[in-house]
Amino acid sequence: MTPLTGGRDGGNSYFPQYESTNMHTDAQGNVLTTESAEAAALFSQAITDFMDYRTTPSARLKEALEKDPDFALAACFRGCFLMMLENRKILPRVRETVDTLRKQANSLTRRERLHIDALGAWADLDILEACRTWEELLTIAPHDILAMKLHHTMAFYTGRSQVLRSVIEGALHAWDETVPGYSAVQGMYAYALEECGAYDEAEKWGRDAVASNPNDLWAIHAVGHVLDMQRRYEEGADWLNFSAEDWSDRNPFKAHLWWHCALFHLGMGDPDRALTMHDDLLRSINSDSYVDVSNQASLLKRLEMQGMDVSTRWELLADHSATRIDDHILTFRDAHFCLALAAAGRTETVRDQLASMVAFAKDNDGWTAEATASTLIPLCDGIVAYESGDYKATCDILWPMRNDLAPVGGSHTQRDLFRQILEDAAVKGNCTELARTLFSERLAQVPGDSMYQAKYVALSA
């Protein structure tokens, strides 16, 4: 898609350059091209709800567009929600939306045009270009919390931790507690700091965010990551001790926090509790959501590697994954679809998925295609080898790439599953020297980790 050109200058709150009677502002003061004050208010509330992971943003945007059908940024935001479904079937619809919005270019601000350009790149599966566009937008409108959150979300799926951090730091000069939404910025910054290894700073920013807004699931999540990386399992389980009723009005992301809580119980040596959480809080959410597939698949595999029998729980995940083998929207998602299929013994379907990945990487450009070729396909080859019991092949594939998995996306904690698979393969395949090296690396990174200390000692027994 061709980026927008022309249009009016200005259009951001930080350096306002003009005023117009057909404009209103969002909660942070960013100019909105709409004649409807009601539509502007609904748009602002949709952003707030989006930050809090509530189920209501789409409905608010629909209502805003009913108030003003020409409200370009509301339509763009709605397109972003469609993209977050991560379903290839919606791509033509989103691209049509982008084409329609570009016809309004001359009446929109530069900030709004950049939002549309970012959505266009995203719909073309060039996540990196979408992120670069949001980064440009934030240089002219650092108060644009929507752009910041969208960038944060998608940069997360490129595995570029330092980018998460630097982009927020570049906008921090415009933020303090007097600006609505500041706690959400604190929460995003906390997560970025954690992914960059600045755990003490991350915990402070995250706890400050939660103190200001106890509804901020991302800030709660950021602190949970710190507790996980520092092996503070009991604190983590207490921190994430929320019931289904507590989060009844939240979207499926809530299950990811329960996934973290289950990992804390697993770390505390209570796999039975972790499996119960899977059955009661994860499996019951929505298996059609790729987030829930990744949560469940990664937890089930961790449980299996600790000797738990998860019985037929793979089957539902494999059934869903089998319907999505040609999507290739996110490498992170495809990796977990592959895991679910391979763990359930769907050999032919996995072969079809891998062939589809190869064709996609060959026939397409952009970040997703490049990451599929460089990282996803060999990772999935390693997963398939592991599930087929060929542990030597698993080690041969995963050992050289163990420190280069970031392009798959996700967090350090999420990608750690693939290292655990390598470690388990090294033990089961009697690759003793390799296993000893892997466990030594673990203990150097987290001294005193009792589980890995026991594994290390067992190799010499």
Question: Can you describe what each PLM-predicted range is?
Answer:
Residues 49, 82, 121, 155, ...:
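Residue at a conserved register position within TPR or TPR-like alpha-solenoid repeats
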Residues 37-40, 47-62, 66-70, 75-112, ...:
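Inter-helical turn/loop elements of alpha-helical hairpins
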Residues 69, 106-108, 142-143, 176, ...:
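Short coil turns that delineate tetratricopeptide repeat
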Residues 38, 71-74, 110, 144-145, ...:
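Residue-level recognition of tetratricopeptide repeat
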Residues 265-461:
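Helix-coil-helix junctions within alpha-helical repeat/solenoid scaffolds
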Residues 38, 45, 78, 117, ...:
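Structural register within alpha-helical repeat arrays
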